[in-house]
Amino acid sequence: MSIKLQPVKGSKDLLPEEFGKHDYIISVSRNLSKLYGFQPISTPIIEYTEIFNRTLGKDSDVLSKEMYVFLDKGNRSVSLRPEFTASIMRAVIYNNLQNKKLPLKYFSSGPAFRYDNPQAGRQRQFHQINLECIGDGSPFSDAEIVLLAYDILKKLNLVDKVNLEINSLGCMESRAKYQQALVEYFSKYRTELSQDSQSRLIENPLRILDSKNLHDKKISASAPSIHDYYTIEARGYFDKVLEYLEFCGIKYTINANLVRGLDYYCHTVFEYVSTQIGAQSTVLGGGRYDGLFEQMGGKLASGKKMLPAIGFAAGIERLALLTNYTPVDVRPIVIIPVDEEYHQHGIILLQKLRNNNITTVIDLQDSISKRLNRANHIKASKVIFIGAIEMREQSYRIKDLDTSNECVIIHNELLSYLQNNCS
């Protein structure tokens, strides 16, 4: 009986070239985040399900349709993380990090899981970069997180392929008034709304604005705008965020229907979107989530009522679809001892070159011609031969595989030669 060798639907093997793209995206993001004062953090892929039940919103597609939920052997409900923010906030509360010097700035990356229909740029197992700034409630913090996202996209040469859409969901008072207006508006179209939107009408009408159903979108196009329901404070906050973005030269479009897909957002929400990757147009998105800490049971020693926070995540697969980056293969040096008696000397040289950060392999089997063929196959730049003459003269015969030229280099000059002549 044969076994299934293909990956589980919605997952895929990351082969070297694509892995190189992912690694580059993560490296660029991590390095830029360091310049902004972010530190690395890692949380488990698996969490107790209640972490997400309390944070994502029961009306969200993620919680109602897309979660990977299991009972473990102890009959505990656990889930594969569908996103990072709730896990990061859990880690903050569990490790009592909120009482350290604020703000906390964290960078993380890794896989997440959603039981969704696989398509370009979205698998059921996907990968994200994730950045969270916890403890800063200023408008500049919002602008700075958008600016960091912009800098990452710029470094990846993607700023010309995306557009920034931004909105404000206002404060709690703003949202309460706006939600009532939405209920009154959408109630007139109740029977025309999709089944999902009908169920959200009372619980969370904001989520109807995020519906992917085309008919829902047509109805939402004429819905009241949240901008008409801001308190003076909420409007002033959003205006200040936009002022900072303009000062930093960041172009944006205000999208009044942008609400993001999770319930913990408030005030600023934003997305960088592209028209080049099909239906999954959002490549990066985030926003402010000031109430999440308290919602998860967090308490501040200072007695303050709220721990403000803002962050964003970007899908690595989607960024990889857009970027033109091609991983540069490091071309190795191949050591070929011509006879077995020179194997030990070859191994000593192998370790020496690796200790000096020169990518090197050694080939000890088969004829010289077969070993040369293998060296060409792995795109080696040079071959170092070790034989009787070389041992006697304390030298190495080196063949350049691009030109087929050969030269002889004495032992103590080999390192400088390779460092100056290897691609």
Swiss-Prot record:
It is an enzyme of class 6 (ligase). PROSITE patterns: AA_TRNA_LIGASE_II. Signal peptide: none annotated. It is found in: Cytoplasm. One of its GO terms (cellular component) is cytoplasm. One of its GO terms (molecular function) is ATP binding. GO terms for biological process: histidyl-tRNA aminoacylation. Keywords: Aminoacyl-tRNA synthetase, ATP-binding, Cytoplasm, Ligase, Nucleotide-binding, Protein biosynthesis. Pfam families: HGTP_anticodon (PF03129), tRNA-synt_His (PF13393). The keyword Cytoplasm applies. It catalyses: tRNA(His) + L-histidine + ATP = L-histidyl-tRNA(His) + AMP + diphosphate + H(+). Its EC number is 6.1.1.21. NCBIfam families: hisS. PANTHER family: HISTIDINE--TRNA LIGASE, MITOCHONDRIAL-RELATED, HISTIDYL-TRNA SYNTHETASE. Homodimer. Belongs to the class-II aminoacyl-tRNA synthetase family. HAMAP family: His_tRNA_synth (MF_00127). This is Histidine--tRNA ligase. The lineage of its organism: Bacteria, Pseudomonadati, Pseudomonadota, Alphaproteobacteria, Rickettsiales.
